[in-house]
């Protein structure tokens, strides 16, 4: 038997994990084992909301060392993280300034300024990326305007996964799928857009040309002295999750469900027409030259904050209590900027309900019901937008990532969207990370080949839409009375 041992480092906004994958060539079987799981979160530092990258690096190294201590020969390592955030380095490779998180308020108002000065349509035609107030384009403008004293010291700007790969290998890389999330990559050249960089105030010399997934960045020297290749995987976690989505045919859509929900479809060509711009659709880079045509939805961040504020530890019990409540009594727009990082999420949700003359969700279960119903309705809205954009309805929706374990939300999504939902795999980002490593090691031919492996090894659950459910009736009523595109606009 021929085995490959690949390690995926998968960092999310709320947690990280080091996972060991064992691939058996002859039977094309893939098994995952969690080596080390650790928390991640936002920190307040010198007036900024930041990431503790030193703690994350220590956790990554701890996980890798654990694998080596077991006597396992690692064939390769790959790192994926969330998008848009970056670390600045000087000529010696030392950090400059703080690793500020995208939920910091420093870029407030700069998106509107960019649209006014450059033109919204021109920015979109250049980048193909949706307008979000925390995109790297606006973060860099905030940095160069608010901290000009740092600029003479900056030699390099590395996005998060590239930074951690650099810390392991000493080699710098700018991976394409994650680079596209910055709104700074030209959609036609796949290189940094000089006009957008100039507006941001960043120096083009801070960046190297983006590289597509599958190259070896460098090597990590394990404690035993072995040189282990570190592969540039599809380092944006959603790009990795999509690779592991067992999409079957062109009529399949995906929803990567976690702190963020990202709904979209794969395409060989980007969509940058007026319809896409009006819907704020993004065309992020994917593997093998594919585009991830999608839309960001605030996701389970709202629930995570409610769990934290209410000190709720038993999520299954909360979901059970939520399921017993009537649907659609409390509806908010999860994509409202007010929910990006409010001081108190529960109060913010209640305020939004009050402003729309709705009952107030008071109990833990009512708050959760508000979030689940609102997300499902927004999923239905976005899926409809995507279908209109491509000119063809979808036949099924694949929900992947940690959020796909929420069976109530899965069923609400199926009912609201009126579409068959297939949930799984849970560790989609990890699996997609591993998939690119196996392709780089010449164990698999391409993404479609890897998806066949996922389909036969992952636990998948199907949810059939119930047209008689409360939320399905609510959607039908909405469609008959509302013509606006955005939910609760």
Swiss-Prot record:
List where this protein forms a coiled coil.
none
Pfam families per UniProt: FGGY_C (PF02782), FGGY_N (PF00370)
- Catalytic site: 237 (proton acceptor)
For the ligand (ATP), the binding residues are 13-17, 259, 304, 402
Q: What is its EC number?
A: 2.7.1.5
Under the heading Gene3D superfamilies, the entry gives:
3.30.420.40
Covalent S-S links between cysteines? 68-222, 353-370, 413-417
GO MF term list: ATP binding; glycerol kinase activity; rhamnulokinase activity
Catalysed reactions, as listed in the record: L-rhamnulose + ATP = L-rhamnulose 1-phosphate + ADP + H(+)
In the record, biological process GO terms are: glycerol metabolic process; rhamnose catabolic process
Look up the record and name the cofactor or cofactors this protein needs: Mg(2+)
Give the CC-aspect GO terms.
Answer: cytosol
Which residues does the annotation say bind substrate? Answer: 83, 236-238, 296
Q: Which UniProt keywords apply?
A: ATP-binding, Disulfide bond, Kinase, Magnesium, Nucleotide-binding, Rhamnose metabolism, Transferase
Report the pathway entry. Carbohydrate degradation; L-rhamnose degradation; glycerone phosphate from L-rhamnose: step 2/3
Q: What class of enzyme is it?
A: transferase
> Which branch of life, at top level?
Bacteria
Q: What is the protein's known function?
A: Involved in the catabolism of L-rhamnose (6-deoxy-L-mannose). Catalyzes the transfer of the gamma-phosphate group from ATP to the 1-hydroxyl group of L-rhamnulose to yield L-rhamnulose 1-phosphate.
UniProt xrefs under HAMAP family:
Rhamnulokinase
- Stated family: Belongs to the rhamnulokinase family.
Q: What is this protein called?
A: Rhamnulokinase
Q: Which organism is it from?
A: Shigella sonnei (strain Ss046)
């Amino acid at each position: 038997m021929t085995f490959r041992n690949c390690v995926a480092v998968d960092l999310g906004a709320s947690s990280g994990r080091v996972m060991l994958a064992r691939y058996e060539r002859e039977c094309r079987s893939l098994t995952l084992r969690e080596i080390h799981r650790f928390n991640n979160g936002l920190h307040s530092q010198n007036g900024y909301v930041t990431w503790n990258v030193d703690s994350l690096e220590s956790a990554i190294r701890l996980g890798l060392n654990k694998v080596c201590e077991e006597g396992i020969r690692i064939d390769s390592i790959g790192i994926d993280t969330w998008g848009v955030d970056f670390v600045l380095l000087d000529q010696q490779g030392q950090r400059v300034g703080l690793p500020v998180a995208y939920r910091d308020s420093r870029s407030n108002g700069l998106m509107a300024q960019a649209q006014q000065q450059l033109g919204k349509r021109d920015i979109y035609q250049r980048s193909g990326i949706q307008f979000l107030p925390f995109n790297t384009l606006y973060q860099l403008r905030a940095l160069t305007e608010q901290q000009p004293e740092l600029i003479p010291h900056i030699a390099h700007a590395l996005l998060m996964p590239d930074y951690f790969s650099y810390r392991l290998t000493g080699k710098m890389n700018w991976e394409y799928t994650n680079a596209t999330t910055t709104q700074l990559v030209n959609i036609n050249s796949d290189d940094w857009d000089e006009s957008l960089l100039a507006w941001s105030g960043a120096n083009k010399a801070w960046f190297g040309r983006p590289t597509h997934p599958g190259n070896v960045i460098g090597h990590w020297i394990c404690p035993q002295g072995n040189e282990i290749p570190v592969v540039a995987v599809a380092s944006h976690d959603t790009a990795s999750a999509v690779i592991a989505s067992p999409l079957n045919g062109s009529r399949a859509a995906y929803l990567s469900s976690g702190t963020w929900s990202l709904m979209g479809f794969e395409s060989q060509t980007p969509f940058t027409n007026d319809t896409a711009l009006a819907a704020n659709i993004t065309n992020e880079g994917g593997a093998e030259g594919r585009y991830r045509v999608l839309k960001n939805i605030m996701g389970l961040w709202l629930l995570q904050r409610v769990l934290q504020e209410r000190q709720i530890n038993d999520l299954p019990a909360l979901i059970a209590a939520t399921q017993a409540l009537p649907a659609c009594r409390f509806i908010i727009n999860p994509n409202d900027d007010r929910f990006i990082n409010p001081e108190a999420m529960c109060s913010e949700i209640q305020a939004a309900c009050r402003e729309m003359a709705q009952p107030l969700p008071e109990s833990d279960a009512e708050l959760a019901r508000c979030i689940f119903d609102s997300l499902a309705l927004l999923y239905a809205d976005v899926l409809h937008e995507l279908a209109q954009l491509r000119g063809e309805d979808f036949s099924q929706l694949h929900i992947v990532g940690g959020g796909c374990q929420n069976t109530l939300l899965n069923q609400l999504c199926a009912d609201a969207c009126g579409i068959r939902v297939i949930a799984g795999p849970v560790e989609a980002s990890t699996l997609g990370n591993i998939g690119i490593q196996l392709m780089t090691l010449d164990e698999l031919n391409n993404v479609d080949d890897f998806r066949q492996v996922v389909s036969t090894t992952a636990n998948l659950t199907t949810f059939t839409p119930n047209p008689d459910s409360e939320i399905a009736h609510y959607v039908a009523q909405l469609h008959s009375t509302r013509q606006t595109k955005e939910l609760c606009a």
